[in-house]
Amino acid sequence: ILLHILLLLSGCSGRNTPPTGQEVTVWFQNNEEDLNTVRDYLATLDFDSMDIKDSKMIVGYTYIISYTYISESQLNKTRLPIREDTVLLALRSLRKAGCKNTYYSRNTLQYCIWRGTSSIDCGVAYRADGQMPDIAYLTQCEPLEVDGWYWYVADFEEWRVRNAG
């Protein structure tokens, strides 16, 4: 069953709907230590936004960077290496467990663990202040059993239809 859930979350099954809250909860429970390691490390840094790529962070810009023209030299100035071995190991472990992206913006830390073919993603999010996570195109969000942690679905098309007019 665990292998099936991991395959679903990693997108290996060709699944075109997001995982259920129960599936995300199981993923969270299996990866909680690594999630907390990364969360605790990022809490020590003083940046408004961060997008983690492998062993480096892009700071000052969020994952929407691909939609905004930024010169390579400007981007290089914003790349910071992660030198903490425990954090690097946690990031590698999360990637192996199906985590697609890790980013922080608007007081919300997001771990995207599933991405659909049409502007849908799903994962876990953390917000220390007890507020609901601030995630673009949020359509579902429920608290997990651990304070500050939530599972979410962000679906642009569903969000657009709900907010039309």
Question: Whereabouts are the PLM-identified features?
Answer:
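Context-gated lysine
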Residues: I1, K53-K56, K77, K96, ...
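Bacterial N-terminal signal peptides
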Residues: I1-L8
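Secretory pathway export signals and precursors
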Residues: L8-L9, R95
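N-terminal export/targeting and maturation segments
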Residues: C12-L88
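Extracytoplasmic electrostatic interaction patches
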Residues: V87-G165
